[in-house]
Amino acid sequence: MSSAHERPDPTQRSSPTRPVAKRSDGDEIQERYLRRAIGEINELGDELLALGDELHVPVLGSGHPLGDVFLLKHHPTQSEIHEGVAFFGRSGQALLKSLQRLGVDPLAVYGTNCLKFGTEEPAQARAWLTRELHIVQPRLVVAMGEPTVAFLGELEFPLSEALDAERPGELQRFTPTIDAMVTPDIDESLDEQGAKTRFWAAFKTLGTWWAELPPY
């Protein structure tokens, strides 16, 4: 679920036999947005790490800081807490396989938990998640599980509408610029075949949404 943003080596000279492509204004603006998002995500991560200790380890979001898709579940698992990274372990592997099956670029995805420690006050967690949503500015939020849907509803995010947890796999409107869809909790959908089927039936809507996304 991690992202890789490769930049050209500034010490590498351009070949004299090839014209150097001029960067467009749009590219430069996008680069500035990305640098700012990386800085803000890192700042949030530093704040969370400063609040942690040996017994309370924050689980930081992972993926592209300007991801089109924002994967969200309620609380971290032990494997995530051990590594300090959201969606580390079985859930992340299951989601990666699902994204690949649907043709969704994993590098366009950001994933996090509502609760960063699993033990913090809800008001703290709501403030941190609100910051993440403002930084990433996703086009689609995938809310995994009813507790996640309820938590989103408590954010009072600007111009947001309440999501219906009883409509799994349907596109809903979260804000005028952010779509949303509800799925079962991925952590509870890894073992029993019926649970796997229910998660996939809802999650595969992401593939249709992604295919219809304008390429610009």
Regions found by a protein language model. Give the residues of each.
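A polyanion-binding, active-site-adjacent surface
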Residues: 2-216
